[in-house]
Amino acid sequence: MTLSPVTRRRIAIFQANKRGFWSLWIFAVLFGLSLFAEFIANDRPLLIRFDGHWYVPVLQDYSEDAFGADFLPTGADYTDPELRKTIEAKGWMIWPLVPFSYTTSVKDLKVPSPAPPSWRNWLGTDDQARDVLARVIYGFRLSVLFGFTLTVVSSAVGVIAGAVQGYYGGMTDLLFQRFIEVWSGMPELYLLIILGSIITPGFWVLLIFLLLFRWMSLTGVVRAEFLRGRNLDYVRAAKALGVSDVIVMWRHILPNAMVATLTYLPFTLSGSVTLLSTLDFLGFGLPPGSPSLGELVAQGKSNLTAPWLGFTAFFVLGGVLMLLIFIGEAVRDAFDPRRLPGASS
């Protein structure tokens, strides 16, 4: 695929912003690693060699009786000392770097939970004896995936709504504007509290609920671009030739409107991550037990005598938001028309 000179120039401007460029690399590497969280932090071995046979517990479930007739035909608990002793007597196991999952309760702690950082638990444990590092890894992945999904879907809905408003104008635009004014005034948090009293919000339920309100963030920007673009000469020429409205909007106006829209996406993503963390902190987010950065912040607040909880939550969440903001600033500079050759100052 051949890139246009303008696109190549924008990429060069983005790369010239070292802070944003390296922030993108760091964020991409961290997120890429978190996608393989089960291979990094898990209470199941990566690989087992037992009695001449190979087992991959991280990918497949095995019953305990597969490792000896003395065990019951139930799911293998690899944290059980007896099972581990039996396996190691006739073979060996390879464990992940962090031998705990986000739900694992650490056994045989030397101090009551929350326990401080140690060689066994690098970031300590929370008030339920769960490894903090494991919950951070899974919580980071969950927060980014949730924020990314919410950002993409809400942006798509917002672009469509703004495009319809700006392109058709008139009564269509007026009705949309009045609806947005009324809908944006709805008490989102109170509605979420009511919803939480009826059902337990899961990942998708919470995502759909927030989508009902988050789509309005980009509508005004897209609407303004379509209001401007629909009166341009090449758009009028396309209409005169009988090109359908959908084709005109998709091929002739939307590419220009997306330039302004793309600069908002990193900031929208950071806002989505912050929103999920805030709801989890207040107790209105994901179900209890889910790996969440906001829940870790709440634990830090409730356990002031365990400062590692608050510090970990602060630095992880602050670091994620800082990286996204730096990326957003670099994207904004790259799409700034004043930075392109021939642009008037």
Annotate the PLM regions.
Residues 125-345:
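Alpha-helical transmembrane segments of integral membrane proteins
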